[in-house]
Amino acid sequence: MLNSVKKLLGDSQKRKLKKYEQLVQEINNLEEKLSDLSDEELRHKTITFKDMLRDGKTVDDIKVEAFAVVREAAKRVLGLRHYDVQLIGGLVLLEGNIAEMPTGEGKTLVSSLPTYVRALEGKGVHVITVNDYLAKRDKELIGQVHEFLGLKVGLNIPQIDPFEKKLAYEADITYGIGTEFGFDYLRDNMAASKNEQVQRPYHFAIIDEIDSVLIDEAKTPLIIAGKKSSSSDLHYLCAKVIKSFQDTLHYTYDAESKSASFTEDGIIKIEDLFDIDNLYDLEHQTLYHYMIQALRAHVAFQCDVDYIVHDEKILLVDIFTGRVMDGRSLSDGLHQALEAKEGLEITEENQTQASITIQNFFRMYPALSGMTGTAKTEEKEFNRVYNMEVIPIPTNRPIIREDKKDVVYVTADAKYKAVREDVLKHNKQGRPILIGTMSILQSETVARYLDEANITYQLLNAKSAEQEADLIATAGQKGQITIATNMAGRGTDILLGEGVHELGGLHVIGTERHESRRVDNQLKGRAGRQGDPGSSQFFLSLEDEMLKRFAQEEVEKLTKSLKTDETGLILTAKVHDFVNRTQLICEGSHFSMREYNLKLDDVINDQRNVIYKLRNNLLQEDTNMIEIIIPMIDHAVEAISKQYLVEGMLPEEWDFASLTASLNEILSVENMPSLSANNVHSPEDLQSVLKETLSLYKERVNELDSHTDLQQSLRYVALHFLDQNWVNHLDAMTHLKEGIGLRQYQQEDPTRLYQKEALDIFLYTYGNFEKEMCRYVARHLGVPENVQ
């Protein structure tokens, strides 16, 4: 078996393989000895390992025996014994890499090994799944093994209260969905006190279906939003105006990146319709924002693909699963733009209060690893962004699934008719069939074609992951036909029913190539698990979404030279190369987009870290607020100095009256020294003139040090001002990101410009926070005796 691993891993990973071979042999050598131990003696191994780690041993020192202990515990508790290949998978995870294991190879059992070892360090281990159902299932199953060995296991799901969350995070091993861990991080950094925070510092995480979490979901940031009012009339008006706009004349839409922008003619049309001179003027920023969101809603979002309308409401659809995302809405006025587009009542707009991308959240873990059936095609991204290798793990039994060559048709209608014929053929044999689609709309299209032939099927649009899992689990029964979005029910194996093995197993039909080979492979991998028979075939057309978005012109050229049969099937061989090439272009485009967005988010991530570090410092009861405020006084004076003592202007031109008024706001002194062109010729002169005033004022502020009640008051006020400024900052950053793409047309590097302008905005935000704190202290102190 291990020789087959060598071939699979290739030359570059042979050294690792030798190490795995040796370690697996060492683990196997301990099996007989451990099987002789009583349950109590086996359980006591956990205490022994913890003592060894406390005495200076490392995880590497104990991993062989610890893996053997988990294997023995799983045999006793679950009746399951880890295969050698599963031990290899566990070793890969322990090293912080990705174990690529096909469907049905027991990834859940594999995770029991590294989670146990890293949990022994006492710092907590997080096991990330793609939905609540799988988190509960895996916690209940694998949790039995860890609890048998004396560890505490917790579950972190959205429905539980903060007290339960705190308990879940205090457990040795915590199961949950990645987004909930991320939202808890954001909520902790909005907490009014330390007692409200639930998480502890991150240590080690294992992500199941890691490609889904870190790549597919990486496009969507985690956002906590509050409500703010918006103009319904303006939303409706902008939606109406946009309907009269023509593609390429008034706007451009890049289907590849799903980004839209106005052309010069479009800008002129808006200015004429609203009777304004310059849409880009600051006073028209709101109008521009409403118009660009109306344009995005009109061209980038399709009903029954990206969202559905139900009970007079816009419900967003998860593009990866086809499920409705209850309670989720788009931020920054885009949701309201969709409501206006569909003629629905406009709801309150969301204002971002805290946000983080999936990438930057998981990069906070010192150690990260993951499992999936399909990751090798994205290895470059995993390596570059997360510094993880993808290591394929061999199957316990050979894969005998037959993956048939794609068939490509000229039209979508011809394709769906061919799908129907293929369904009839395999259904007559009694074989179960799984038809994978890309969206709810496509699922319904396939269903309509099957209805025309009176074919009975199960349309999988389940409202909960649990129902999905039940339906997917029965998709392997004799004669069963299931239509599902390709990611639906992921994590649940399709077991073959009685007699199906002899008929040839599950037949999988793909109705369109995805924008990633990885997702195609996931669909194929539904069949042929654990050495079962099975087959797969993709039915494509030149009208498919991927080809329309990434190769429309090439399709038009290609069509002229194609040979087809009477059904519309393309017989020209080069069409397959064309499809494969387009898919690679698509993958590269998405990777570039994620990389670009990550570069932009890295900027705000650095800013977020500064704000959250200060915020957590403010939450500490022993933080001396006066020590924080004293430096702010100097910073605020310096900022005001820069504002009014403008470089390049003569001192006689400086506005000393406004300068004095601003200083009085933050210093609260009765007699501010006289400031004019006579005694202030530079910012340094101002510092000299104010030296005694500042010194005496700081002494008065320092006297507040002993006032405990005031310290607490200052803490709450500082948190309030900081949060308020941060929310406004996020709003400003959103608008900056919106407009930065336009700079490409000015021959400027948008990333560099974004970094520069983001820094300016951040310095303004932080400076404003410091000035507000100084004003508050000045008002509290009141006016003292005269300072001459």
Swiss-Prot record:
GO terms for molecular function: ATP binding; protein-exporting ATPase activity. HAMAP family: SecA (MF_01382). It catalyses: ATP + H2O + cellular proteinSide 1 = ADP + phosphate + cellular proteinSide 2. It comes from the Bacteria. Its EC number is 7.4.2.8. Coiled coil: none annotated. SMART domains: SecA_DEAD, SecA_PP_bind. InterPro entries: Helicase_ATP-bd (IPR014001), Helicase_C-like (IPR001650), P-loop_NTPase (IPR027417), SecA (IPR000185), SecA2_Bac_anthr (IPR030908), SecA_CS (IPR020937), SecA_DEAD (IPR011115), SecA_motor_DEAD (IPR014018). ATP binds at residues 86, 104-108, 493. This is Protein translocase subunit SecA 2. It is a peripheral membrane protein. Part of the Sec protein translocase complex. Interacts with the SecYEG preprotein conducting channel. Has a central role in coupling the hydrolysis of ATP to the transfer of proteins into and across the cell membrane, serving as an ATP-driven molecular motor driving the stepwise translocation of polypeptide chains across the membrane. Its main location: membrane. It comes from Bacillus thuringiensis (strain Al Hakam). It is found in: Cell membrane; Cytoplasm. GO terms for biological process: intracellular protein transmembrane transport; protein import; protein targeting; protein transport by the Sec complex. Gene3D superfamilies: Helical scaffold and wing domains of SecA, P-loop containing nucleotide triphosphate hydrolases, SecA, preprotein cross-linking domain. Monomer and homodimer. Part of the essential Sec protein translocation apparatus which comprises SecA, SecYEG and auxiliary proteins SecDF. Other proteins may also be involved. Keywords: ATP-binding, Cell membrane, Cytoplasm, Membrane, Nucleotide-binding, Protein transport, Translocase, Translocation, Transport. NCBIfam families: PRK09200.1, secA, SecA2_Bac_anthr. Belongs to the SecA family. The keyword Transport applies. One of its GO terms (cellular component) is cell envelope Sec protein transport complex.
